[in-house]
């Protein structure tokens, strides 16, 4: 009886160790997949490929960038991205400094920094921006990761307001 109990204990310990190792392997694989997704996303922006850029978002994603209202849904994001990639001056690079995957394995987030150059539609001057971002990802049924929330904050102060002609 004691021998059977000892065998059961060893088998249980080995099973738990295997499960723990598998969880760690899955977590590491998910982190690498999210990192690879962001690397590909930067390449898609460099190629100015609207379809590939938008494919990184879920259908119900939200994009929040400085100076504009939140953009909700893939169709609205596509419209914004189309305008961006039409700009010959567009150059966007971003790099995650942190990637974290939830223990549940279905959500992840990245935070990092970005640099952006584009043409100001009003002044026609090139704007150089830099700042931080946080992107929340949801794991898809096919195992890929797509952004559900993409939030950008600029480190560049807004232009100084000019006094109005009414003196207010």
Predicted regions and their residues:
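Bacterial N-terminal signal peptides that target proteins for export
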Residues: 1-9
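Repetitive helical segments and hydrophobic/amphipathic motifs
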Residues: 12-13
């Amino acid at each position: 009886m004691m021998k059977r109990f000892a065998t059961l204990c060893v088998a249980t310990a080995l099973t738990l160790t295997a499960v723990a190792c598998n969880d760690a392997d899955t977590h590491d694989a998910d982190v690498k997949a999210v990192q690879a997704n962001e690397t590909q996303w930067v390449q898609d922006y460099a190629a100015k490929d609207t379809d590939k850029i938008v494919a990184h978002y879920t259908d119900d994603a939200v994009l929040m960038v400085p100076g504009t209202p939140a953009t909700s849904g893939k169709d609205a994001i596509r419209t914004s991205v189309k305008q961006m990639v039409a700009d010959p001056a567009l150059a966007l690079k971003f790099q995650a400094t942190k990637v974290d995957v939830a223990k549940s394995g279905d959500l992840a987030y990245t935070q990092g920094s970005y640099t952006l150059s584009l043409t100001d539609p009003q002044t026609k001057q090139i704007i150089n921006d830099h700042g931080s971002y946080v992107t929340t990802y949801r794991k898809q049924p096919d195992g890929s990761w797509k952004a559900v929330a993409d939030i950008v904050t600029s480190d560049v102060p807004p232009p100084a307001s000019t006094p109005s002609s009414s003196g207010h």
